[in-house]
Swiss-Prot record:
Family: Belongs to the universal ribosomal protein uS10 family.
Protein name stated in the entry: Small ribosomal subunit protein uS10
Alphabetically ordered keywords of this record: Ribonucleoprotein, Ribosomal protein
SMART domains: Ribosomal_S10
GO biological process, one term: translation
Length: 102
C-alpha cells in the first residue's frame, strides 16, 4: 500500500480501556514494520444531564450526571499488507468504538 496512510479514531467512555487498546494497536503496527504517528489525545466530550431529584415537588433540588467520551487518534504511515491483516485480526475491548479511514 504505497503512499497511503491509515487513520484510526478510537472512542470510549473509560480512558483506561481506550489507552490499553491504543497500546495494542501501536505494538501490532510496529511489530509488522509500519511506523505510527500518535496516539494523539483529542478533546474529551462531556455531556451533562440535569434531572429533578424529586418526582413531585422541589424544583430547586436537582441532580447532575455527566458522560465523558474520551478520544484518541492514530496514523499508521506506509502500512504493509501484513499490518492490515494483523489489524483486522486484532480483538479489542468491548467498550471501544473504532473508526478506520484509508
Amino acid at each position: 500500500m504505497n503512499g497511503q496512510n491509515i487513520r484510526i479514531r478510537l472512542k470510549a467512555f473509560d480512558h483506561r480501556i481506550l489507552d490499553a487498546s491504543t497500546r495494542e494497536i501501536v505494538s501490532t503496527a510496529k511489530r509488522t514494520g509500519a511506523s505510527v504517528r500518535g496516539p494523539v489525545p483529542l478533546p474529551t466530550r462531556i455531556e451533562k444531564f440535569t434531572v429533578n431529584r424529586s418526582p413531585h415537588i422541589d424544583k430547586k433540588s436537582r441532580e447532575q450526571f455527566e458522560m465523558r467520551t474520551h478520544k484518541r487518534l492514530l496514523d499508521i504511515v506506509d502500512p504493509t499488507p501484513q499490518t492490515v491483516d494483523a489489524l483486522m485480526k486484532l480483538d479489542l475491548a468491548a467498550g471501544v468504538d473504532v473508526e478506520i479511514k484509508l
